[in-house]
Amino acid sequence: MAIRGRPRRAEADAEILDAALAMLREGGYRALSLDEVARRAGTAKSSIYRRWASKAALAAEVVRREVPAPEGEVAAAFEALMNGPFGGVIASLIGEAQESAETRSMVLDLLAPYRVAGDDVLGPILFRRLLND
């Protein structure tokens, strides 16, 4: 079966993610605009939507790319994550997850490496982070 449409540029993913990363660092999740990401990446907004279904999906992918998977003690790794440069983005995604099942699923997937069966280490750390924002 032939692929229709223009072929995807391999470097476009990185350009889009780099533009989104810059915006998240500049103003956090609320400042992330797909129109502006497209402008900065030199691509069409539709190209972003072909790769990521939503603003939340793009932000989650940036966090996934930029934040290493936890090693060692999960609570310490999660605390470092929430107090690091992406803590505010993750807190915003968690807020968005209250309104959207799709975002909730992405957040659960994003935080899965920090979950320990039978051990609620995330709750108190996350609660403190949300109170500080």
Regions found by a protein language model. Name each.
Residues 52, 62-63:
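DNA major-groove recognition helix of helix-turn-helix
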Residues 15, 19-27, 89-96, 124, ...:
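Solvent-exposed, amphipathic alpha-helical segments
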Residues 61, 68-95:
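Hydrophobic alpha-helical connector segments
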Residues 46:
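Key DNA-contact positions within bacterial/archaeal DNA-binding proteins
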Residues 1-42, 53-57:
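Basic, helix-initiating cap at the start of DNA-binding domains
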Residues 51-53, 126-127:
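Tryptophan-centric aromatic hotspots in well-structured domains and transmembrane helices
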Residues 77-81, 120-133:
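Extended low-complexity intrinsically disordered regions
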